[in-house]
Amino acid sequence: MEGALTARDKVGVQDFVLLDAYTSESAFLENLRKRFRENLIYTYIGTLLVSVNPYQELGIYTASQMELYQGVNFFELPPHVYAIADNAYRMMCSELNNHFILISGESGAGKTEASKKILQYFAVTCPMTESLQIARDRLLLSIPVLEAFGNAKTLRNDNSSRFGKYMDIQFDFQGVPVGGHIISYLIEKSRVVYQNHGERNFHIFYQLLAGGGSERLASLGLERDPQLYKYLSQGHCARESPISDKNDWETVCGAFSVIGFTEADLENLFGIIASVLHLGNVCFKGDKQGCASVPDTHEIKWIAKLLGVCPAVLLEALTHRKIEAKTEEVICPLTVELSVYARDAMAKAVYGRTFTWLVNRINSSLVNKDFTQKTVIGLLDIYGFEVFDKNGFEQFCINYCNEKLQQLLIERTLKAEQAEYESEGIEWETVQYFNNKIICDLVEERHRGIISILDEECIRPGPATDLSFLEKLEEKVGKHAHFQTRKLAGPKGRKRIGWLEFCLLHYAGEVTYCTKGFLEKNNDLLYRHLKEVLCSSKNSILRECFLVAELENRRRPPTVGTQFKNSLSSLLEILISKEPSYIRCIKPNERKEPSKFDDFLISHQIKYLGLMEHLRVRRAGFAYRRKYEHFLQRYKSLCPDTWPHWHGPPGEGVERLIKYIGYQPQDYKLGKTKIFIRFPRTLFATEDAFEFSKHQLVSRIQATYKGCLGRREYMKKRQAATKLEAHWRGVLARKEIKRRRWAVQIIRRFVKGFINRDKPLCPDNEEFVVLVRKNYILNLRYHVPKNVLDKSWLRPPGILENASNLLRRMCTRNLVRKYCRGISAERKAMMQQKVVTSEIFRGKKEGYAESLNQLFAGSRLGVSTSSLSDGILVIHISPADKQQKGDVILQCEHIFEVATKLAMLIRKEHTVRVVQGSLQFYVSPGREGTIVFETGEEDQVYKDKNGQLRVVSAGKKT
């Protein structure tokens, strides 16, 4: 906000508290004008928001704007309706108390739009879950439905609320909107049957005709032209260009679907709306006796069809009146005038009760079935102060309501604030203001107020008229300073007050009321005959609106004025129990033109809204005050002396706290029970410090809590591990005991078997013998002889001697068998020779035993001869024995016979070699010689000079 002060000459100040000439009304007005010209429609007076209706779209209600104001301190950004909404929401969440936002101002000042913007802000910015999305949508879409049935175009406002509305938005402990509740006040039923020139009936009638499908209109017996219906054509502005009835109809139908209206509900609802239009077109004609009749019953038939009643009974109820006299019932015909009254009374009653049913139906869809405690923010959007050329009973009630709200504002701001300073002992210069309690008492005082006088006149015996009511007012309250009639006024006043009028000096100025219709509208009576017809309706909505029990109740119902007074009292009780926020709406001109600033009109509103008095109180006062207990409870974490608990008096704790924070003497005052902080910036700094401290505390609490959870989890796991370990150790111990018991039994059986091992097989040694056998067999497999020459054998136990011998023989046989199967034929022959040798020489010749391990060699003898015709034969002897001479060289004539017999003798035919050229032979071990075979002329054998033996053959062998 401070950044905007540099541009204050052009756009004014954002807070009227910053005005230098804060006591000057002209300076106030000029600041408002500067901001209005720059399209800055919002200005603060402290925490009160002043809003000027721009009559145009400004583009300041976007989602980005909502996000900008979300969670920001109140004065950090320019004034906005979102700031009021966000401040109320944050205060509600932090302090868990209920709030309400009071939006006040003249009709056409923008109250309804302000309430819609606040509702949209809550819907968009509040935390939301998918399951609560429906509740939020229903809350939002209830607004266009209520506007369609309760708003209308007036001379001053195209969308004027013709009923009072208080809406509670319910939030859970997390700040999530979970539901809502709506209370309606005094819908202007007279508008159903009559509108001033330039005004319209309720929007829903025009929306149905403009947007309803052809089939729907045909089923309701309606035409699209509103001018065809008397109840819609009296204002001569049925089709108003700024209002798009067709688009609004689509919005309303979509809202009905989201809120949860069934098709049957809509059929019955639109049937009632259509029946009201048909009622307005019912015409009456009087006969010679003055009795009314309906010449054309076309409309009657449609009404009967739509409401589900008998046409004949309905016609009789509109033209006759049933009078009960003790035990008799008398039906009297009505005049045309009374029939018109009955028709209009029926239309008003049907529409008024249907509107009440609609509000209750919406409430049932908004109700939250969770009965946990909730906080609420209330939105009060109620008709503004109205002054027309001709003001009737409705304007009287509306302006009385505004007087009560003005009184509430005075009580909660001007009067209460100054009284608080005095009671707390704070030095204060009293600000004078007009207290409108005197006007409220004039209207509502019991037995002496205008409403009480009106009720007395309605119920007194004898003919009561509007004139007699005016005379009674002159008699009872004629001396009141704020009441005037033509008879009581001076010469100047008589010119502006008619003979049937009285004038009240309201807080907003003088208003003249015409008493014509006061008694009728206050009674709001519906003939019993018509009630009976409506109670018999087959329309489910009407059956809920008109109960048969009403016919049995003979007591006179409360008048409209009394009902309205009681409902206002209940409303004020609701508002007093909540923390307030205020929005004061100002209408810039009467013509609804953008950028037009009417100084006189705005100055008048500034005066009667009490803005100057509020500014003076705010300028001289303190921006924030709180009881010591609450202040200390909230901010005690900022001071070590007060955290976590302060055990002394709260006042001393607060004093210690602000001293530690560093408050300057001019920033605050300490009262008897409260602390008063003068400047918002001081509170903001404290709140920022608290937020920082809160984050630190939260972090510490989280760490401690997580540590606690971790320790708890660790101890849990440790106990589980200990228990698991104990159980496992028990399992292992039991297994060990079982194993040892088994071992003891085994050892015992083993010892017993060992002792009895030599006895015949019996139970005492059976297991031992089996074990010994098993072990012996297992060990024997690793000590079996590898060949037939290996005579080793594992020594058997005594009990296995026989088995061991048997196994040994089997093993030996197996080895011999394997050896025999693996011997070659040559070796077999050699072994056979060994057998023959054994038979010849064993025990007879020395050296035989040493020769046993020597195999007979097949190559020990060999025979060689040449391929020539010589008779040379060489017998080769193995040179292994060094004592032997060399090979034997023979020459014989019968070489073929000798060689053959030698070969047969050694059984090796291949031992005889036939060589060519030469052959080698051993002369002695280690010394070789050579025989060379060649041919010549004659046979000869000689040794050449090289020492080689040469054998010459005269011819080749043949």
Swiss-Prot record:
Gene3D superfamilies: 1.10.10.820, 1.20.5.190, 1.20.5.4820, 1.20.58.530, Kinesin motor domain (3.40.850.10), Myosin VI head, motor domain, U50 subdomain (1.20.120.720)
Phosphoserine: residues bearing it: 365
Entry comment describing in which tissues the protein is expressed: Highly expressed in the central nervous system, including the forebrain, midbrain and lower medulla. In the lower medulla, it is broadly expressed throughout the reticular formation. It is expressed in the retrotrapezoid nucleus and the nucleus of the solitary tract, as well as motor neurons of the facial, vagal and ambiguus nuclei. Expressed in neonatal inner-ear organs.
Keyword Repeat belongs to the record: yes
InterPro entries cross-referenced by the UniProt entry: IQ_motif_EF-hand-BS, Kinesin_motor_dom_sf, Myosin_head_motor_dom-like, Myosin_TH1, MYSc_Myo1, P-loop_NTPase
Domain TH1, residue spans: 773-955
IQ domain: residues covered: 694-716, 717-746
A Pfam match: Myosin_TH1
Positions of the UniProt region annotated as Actin-binding: 568-590
Record keywords, A-Z: Actin-binding, ATP-binding, Motor protein, Myosin, Nucleotide-binding, Phosphoprotein, Repeat
Domain of life: Eukaryota
GO molecular function, one term: cytoskeletal motor activity
SMART domains given in the database record: IQ, MYSc
Residues that coordinate or bind ATP: 105-112
Biological function: Myosins are actin-based motor molecules with ATPase activity. Unconventional myosins serve in intracellular movements. Their highly divergent tails are presumed to bind to membranous compartments, which would be moved relative to actin filaments.
Family to which this protein belongs: Belongs to the TRAFAC class myosin-kinesin ATPase superfamily. Myosin family.
Protein name (Swiss-Prot/TrEMBL): Unconventional myosin-Ih
Organism this protein belongs to: Mus musculus
Gene designation: Myo1h
